[in-house]
Each structure stands twice: as structure tokens, then as C-alpha cells.
């Protein structure tokens, strides 16, 4: 392993653990995203700085603000800790959020979008750009109503800042999607990957085919890489012009490093997660690391919402089961009472001998 990659691997683990100490009750998956935010900038997470930025978020928001949500607060604090004036950045993100809320639902996805746009030093969010983002999102929804969700609103706004027309963006996303969906069973993941490609130069079909080739090369190298939420980060890495064999070798080296670290098991899902984190680390060396981080943030939000819904569903099932048992018990009690009453009635009706 080359020294640069080895350092990134070590920094990733250190950053993950530092964020975990500050946000003890948040999801482990968020710690990994935050760790890569720091690695992508060549910075190290600092406990005191993170705590300071957590207070900045509280200072500039109300009690039940989406900015304080456990699904995003660690990511936001990490991003704030990297800028010289976090209070100014927080104010700008708040202003952007207010503007975006006129066109999109005020969810954690929109909070994340506002922060990402506030990080674009050479761009300014205007009413016109927000409307353009909304129009791009509507086009996505019209084209693939079932596949399009809140995650796509983040990409729609980022796409709105590209120099391409709405027609060009829509056509490129569709062209890339058609190539990818022949190769991968997850249509939603294919659409997100195609959106990542639309924000870069080159022919969409060629970019999609390069992703197919990279994925196949990972499979041949016996690296367990998923093709659901994991696909978009791999697409962002594939934007790099680094030869595929080099990327595969580095991903394998990072994967081997993570194998010996705390938090990685041997189940299939855990192997896929480990490979995803290896891709994250490798991407920090190349063009496309910003897109990797965006896909990681949105995918992690999706996962956290899915877990929340599953938890609510599980709770609802338990409640229903308990109610059914109560009804059944009540019914049995009534039946027993009825039997006893009938027996007494029969006994009273029997003639004396």
C-alpha cells in the first residue's frame, strides 16, 4: 500500500472514533460519513472544534429544527468545523434553507442540500436557481415517478448549478440509466448513479459502461461490493481517469486494512459495508470525492429513515399482536362464562328424582 493511502486509512479510523466520542448516541453509519468528510479535505477531526460547532447549530436554530436532527447534526457539525467562520456559514445555510423551503418540503434532505450549497464558494443560491432545481426534480418525477424520492431533490439542486440545460441533464440521466439498469437489478440506484454522471463531462453511455466495468472488476477480485446504495459512491469514484486495475488494487488494499479494524464483521452485509468504506477512502485521492460524499450523506439518510420506519412498523405489529391477544383472551373469558352459565341453567332445569 502506498504511503498516501495508508495515511488516509489511518486518518479515517481516527476521525470516525473522534466523531463517535462527541456524538455518542448517533448512528455508527453517520460516524463513517463524517470521517470521510474530514479525509476528503485532508483534515483531522477535533473534539473541541466539533463541540463548538454543535453549539453553533443550537444557537442559530429552534428547539425542534431539522438542523438539530440526530440524522444530520453530526454531518453538519463536521462540515462547519472545516470552515474558518462557522457562524457565518451556519447563517448562510439557514438562509438557503428558508429559500429552498418555498419549493421543497423542509426535511433533513433539504437541510443537507442547504449546507452543501453553502459550501459552493463560487456559487450563490438564488430564487432562479431554486426554481431551476425544482423543475429538474419535476422532470425526474415525471420520467420515473416510482423511482424518484426525497434523495433526488438533493441531486436536482446540485444539477441546477451545472452549465447544462434542463433538457441536456434529463437526457443524460436517462441515457446513463438505460445502460446501468441492464447491468444492475436496482433501478433506483441506477438512476442515482446516472444523476452523478450528469454533473460531469463526457458521454453518459461511456461513463455508465466504465462503472459496469469497475464493478465487474471488483467482483473478479472477490470484493463483496453491493449494487444498491453502494452504487452511486462507486459511480462517483469511476469519474476519475485512473485505470480500473489501479482502482481495484487500491480498494482491495483499503478493504484489507479495514478488515482488522473494530466494527467490521464477516456477514455479507458487513462485507459490503466494508468494501463501501474502502471505496470512500480511495476516492479521497481522486477527482469525484465531493460527489462520493454527497452520495454517502443522502444514502445514509435514506438508511436511517428506513430503520426508523421499520422500527415504527415493528412497534405497530407488536401493538396489534397485543390487542389481538387481549381480544382473544376476552373472547375466551366470555365463552367460559357462557359455558358456566349454561351448565348452571341446565342443572336448574333437570327434574328432581
What residue spans do the PLM features occupy?
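Amphipathic alpha-helical elements of HEAT/ARM-like alpha-solenoid repeat scaffolds that form extended
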Residues: 30-40, 70-81, 108-119, 151-160, ...
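Context-gated lysine
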Residues: 2, 7, 21-24, 51, ...
Amino acid at each position: 500500500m502506498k504511503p498516501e493511502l495508508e495515511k488516509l486509512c489511518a486518518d479515517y479510523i481516527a476521525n470516525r472514533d473522534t466523531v463517535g466520542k462527541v456524538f455518542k448516541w448517533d448512528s455508527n453509519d453517520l460516524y463513517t460519513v463524517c470521517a470521510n468528510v474530514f479525509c476528503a479535505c485532508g483534515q483531522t477531526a477535533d473534539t473541541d472544534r466539533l463541540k463548538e460547532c454543535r453549539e453553533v447549530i443550537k444557537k442559530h436554530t429552534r428547539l425542534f429544527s431539522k438542523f438539530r436532527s440526530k440524522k444530520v447534526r453530526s454531518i453538519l457539525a463536521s462540515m462547519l468545523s472545516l470552515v474558518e467562520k462557522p457562524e457565518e456559514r451556519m447563517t448562510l445555510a439557514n438562509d438557503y434553507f428558508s429559500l429552498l423551503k418555498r419549493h421543497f418540503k423542509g426535511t433533513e434532505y433539504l437541510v443537507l442540500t442547504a449546507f452543501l450549497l453553502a459550501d459552493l464558494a463560487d456559487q450563490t443560491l438564488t430564487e432562479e436557481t431554486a426554481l431551476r432545481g425544482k423543475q429538474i426534480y419535476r422532470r425526474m418525477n415525471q420520467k420515473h415517478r416510482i423511482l424518484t424520492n426525497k434523495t433526488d431533490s438533493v441531486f436536482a439542486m446540485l444539477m441546477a448549478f451545472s452549465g447544462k440545460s434542463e433538457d441536456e441533464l434529463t437526457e443524460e440521466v436517462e441515457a446513463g440509466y438505460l445502460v446501468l439498469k441492464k447491468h444492475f437489478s436496482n433501478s433506483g440506484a441506477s438512476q442515482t448513479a446516472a444523476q452523478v454522471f450528469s454533473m460531469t463531462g463526457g458521454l453518459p453511455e461511456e461513463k455508465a459502461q466504465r462503472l459496469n466495468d469497475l464493478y465487474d472488476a471488483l467482483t473478479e477480485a472477490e470484493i463483496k461490493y453491493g449494487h444498491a446504495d453502494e452504487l452511486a459512491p462507486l459511480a462517483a469514484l469511476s469519474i476519475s481517469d485512473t485505470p480500473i486495475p489501479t482502482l481495484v488494487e487500491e480498494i482491495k488494499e483499503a478493504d484489507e486494512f479495514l478488515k482488522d479494524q473494530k466494527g467490521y464483521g464477516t456477514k455479507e452485509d458487513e462485507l459490503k459495508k466494508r468494501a463501501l468504506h474502502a471505496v470512500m477512502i480511495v476516492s479521497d485521492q481522486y477527482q469525484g470525492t465531493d460527489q462520493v460524499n454527497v452520495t454517502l450523506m443522502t444514502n445514509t439518510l435514506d438508511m436511517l429513515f428506513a430503520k426508523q420506519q421499520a422500527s415504527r412498523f415493528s412497534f405497530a405489529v407488536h401493538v396489534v399482536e397485543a390487542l389481538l391477544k387481549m381480544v382473544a383472551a376476552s373472547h375466551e373469558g366470555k365463552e367460559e362464562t357462557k359455558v358456566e352459565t349454561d351448565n348452571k341453567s341446565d342443572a336448574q332445569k333437570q327434574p328432581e328424582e
